[in-house]
From Swiss-Prot:
This protein's UniProt keywords: ATP-binding, Chaperone, Nucleotide-binding, Phosphoprotein, Stress response
Upregulation: By stress conditions e.g. heat shock.
Name this polypeptide is given: Chaperone protein DnaK
Compositional bias of kind Low complexity: 609-625
Gene name of this polypeptide: dnaK
Biased composition (Basic and acidic residues): 635-644
Gene3D superfamilies registered for this protein in UniProt: 1.20.1270.10, 3.30.420.40, Actin, Chain A, domain 4, Substrate Binding Domain Of DNAk, Chain A, domain 1
Length: 644
């Protein structure tokens, strides 16, 4: 049975792991790195670059290089958070027909799950290269505070990438798994996982218990902000640089897409450097130009300056910590360990804030970039039956309910309820002889339904005429282990029932997913075609080079017609390389091989003649070295001692 891999699909970076021989193995990608930038670039010739190659060309291709797409997954175009990002991204965020936030590259509209699927395909290929076998199943992580639409969209991305998503698991829970299984301490421990990544923030309070030799991980509460992360920290630095440059040079860089891409790269680098040094210098020559000529950017940023720029962002992470502690029904002093996850937790100021709130030093023995993927791989081994000593009890992050009379949100499942779970409640009609009811499903904590996230709606029709309040409509909410919701409504009188898996009143339809799966498969074929073309080109180039070299050395030994034939074949190969058709390249290479046979014969004959000449000269030298007179007699001699 093939292994179930664990994938941390991050906003900024992604990581893949697998359980191998009882140990978690973080798998290096083709570039030799343990994490892969979650960046996808769409090239002019139709090629799709993922990871480091996409990041390297971002400066020259900003409009078609997509990053931080996870911030859009499962979101509506009109949401405040999306509107805020539209003006910050160099690429185009557009409104889909169903109201979702999509992206546009090279004239095509793409759904965020489609883009994320490219990253997942890279992760899948990385695992396959390591394991040496096909991989079809995965556990994929999401921020704990992701709502139903975002979870569903992540699952869709997995399907488009050719993966059966066995489980969607919360990132802090995955990190706790990786941490908890490592430790030998006995007894119950309560841990706080503070996860500040590239685009999202989560905090979870988790209890790790030893139950008859089995480690039980129970999530007590979770909270967070799905639009707060390293990208926002980068943006603060970018805004500061733009402001300083405008003051100094009078030029507004925010209007220059190419400059913005360079600033983004520089801001990220500066942020990372300031975690280990007190000051860094941003030096970007030829950042822009005006009538007076080219402009260069040179700016020093201190750690203190960075901290003042992002202070409010760090402060925003503390309130969710407070709420999570309260919801878990514990005190801060009850927390035994604080685990930091996500690249942003390397920032000293973040660590300081966390220590200040929890009153203890955070653990330093967890790799913030790899713990989540490691936990996902552990969960994969549990699902495949390889591990039987782990039990994971996760929760739903937000309350779920339906809209009832007066627009009120009637909660069916409270936030932080352990999943999977099921809950039923009976409702009735609001009007006399009402023939149908519309069940509108919401997720959130507000008392009024409209203030929460609308997940979807469906109708239950065919209710027999009756006075209001008489029909009995049983509504059932069922959350599976992935945190995905299924809702049904049943008329107890007639037995009529209608049910839906909440796909949000947006999301991708089954047809769209199937189309994207086919597109992805076609892309895989295209990738294979491009790889074969590259190989054919390399072989043709090598043959052209070798033939030209031989022609220079041995051309004068050929007849004019033979030489002409080879030169024509060489020219044909070079022309076919420009056209880029593999079949044509192969045909012209074959023709060149045939044409240069005579050249090969001459080279072979020449080499044989040289070899024969060398052997003859060696023989001559050996003969010359022999003594002239073979009739040599050894002479007797006698030693005569002289008297002194």
């Amino acid at each position: 049975m093939s292994k179930i891999i664990g994938i941390d699909l991050g906003t900024t970076n992604s990581c893949v792991a697998v359980m191998d021989g009882g140990q978690v193995k973080i798998i290096e990608n083709a570039e030799g790195a343990r994490t892969t930038p979650s960046i996808v670039a769409y090239m002019e010739d139709g090629e799709i670059l993922v990871g480091a190659p996409a990041k390297r060309q971002a400066v020259t291709n900003p409009k078609n290089t997509l990053y931080a797409v996870k911030r859009l997954i499962g979101r509506k175009f009109d949401e405040k958070a999306v509107q805020k990002d539209i003006h910050l991204m160099p690429y185009t965020i557009t409104k889909a027909d169903n109201g979702d936030a999509w992206v546009e590259v090279r004239g095509s509209k793409l759904a965020p799950p489609q883009v994320s699927a490219e990253v997942l395909r890279k992760m899948k290929k990385t695992a396959e290269d390591y394991l040496g076998e096909p991989v079809t199943e995965a556990v994929i992580t999401v921020p704990a505070y992701f709502n139903d639409s975002q979870r569903q969209a992540t699952k869709d991305a997995g399907r488009i990438a050719g993966l059966e998503v066995k489980r969607i698991i919360n990132e802090p829970t995955a990190a706790a798994l990786a941490f908890g299984l490592d430790k030998t301490e006995k007894g119950d421990r309560k841990i706080a996982v503070y996860d500040l990544g590239g685009g999202t923030f989560d905090v979870s309070i988790i209890e790790i218990a030893d139950v008859d030799g089995e480690k039980q991980f129970e999530v007590l509460s979770t909270n967070g902000d799905t639009f707060l992360g390293g990208e926002d920290f980068d943006q603060r630095i970018i805004d500061y640089i733009i402001g300083e440059f405008k003051k100094e040079q009078g030029v507004d860089l925010s209007k220059d897409v190419l400059a913005l891409q360079r600033l983004k790269e520089a801001a990220e680098k500066a942020k990372i450097e300031l975690s280990s040094s007190q000051q860094t210098e941003i030096n970007l020559p030829y950042i822009t130009a005006d009538a007076s000529g080219p402009k260069h950017l040179n700016l020093k940023i201190t750690r203190a300056k960075l901290e003042s720029l992002v202070e409010e962002l760090i402060e925003r992470t503390i309130e969710p910590c407070r709420v999570a502690i309260k919801d878990a029904g514990v005190k801060v002093s009850d927390i035994d360990d604080v685990i930091l996850v996500g690249g942003m937790t390397r920032m000293p100021k973040v660590q300081e804030k966390v220590k200040e709130f929890f009153g203890r030093e955070p653990r330093k023995d967890v790799n913030p970039d790899e713990a989540v993927a490691a936990g996902a791989a552990i969960q994969g081994s549990v699902l495949s039956g390889d591990r039987k000593d782990v039990l994971l009890l996760d929760v739903t992050p937000l309350s779920l309910g339906i809209e009832t009379l007066g627009g009120v949100m009637t909660k069916m499942i409270q936030k932080n309820t352990t999943i999977p779970t099921r809950f039923s409640q009976t409702f009735s009609t609001a009007d006399d002889n009402q023939p149908a009811v519309t069940i509108k499903v919401f997720q959130g904590e507000r008392e009024i339904a409209a203030g929460n996230k609308a997940l979807g709606e469906f109708n239950l029709e065919g209710i027999p005429p009756a006075p209001r309040g008489l029909p009995q409509i049983e509504v059932t909410f069922d959350i599976d282990a992935n945190g995905i919701l299924h809702v049904s409504a049943k008329d107890k009188g007639t037995g009529k029932e209608n049910k839906i898996t909440i796909k949000a009143n947006s999301g991708l339809s089954e047809d769209e997913i199937q189309r994207m799966v086919k597109d992805a498969e076609a892309n895989a074929e295209e990738d294979h075609r491009l790889a074969e073309l590259a190989l054919a080109r390399n072989q043709a180039d090598a043959l052209v080079h070798a033939t030209r070299k031989s022609l220079t050395e041995y051309g004068d030994k050929l007849e004019a017609a033979e030489k002409e034939s080879i030169e024509k074949a060489l020219k044909d190969v070079e022309e076919s390389l420009k056209a880029g058709d593999k079949a044509e390249i192969d045909a012209k290479v074959e023709a060149l091989t045939q044409a240069s046979q005579k050249l090969g014969e001459k080279m072979y004959a020449d080499a044989q003649a040289q070899q024969a000449a060398q052997q003859a000269s060696h023989q001559q030298a050996a003969d010359n070295a022999k003594p002239v007179d073979d009739n040599v007699v050894d002479a007797d001699f006698k030693e005569v001692k002289r008297d002194n």
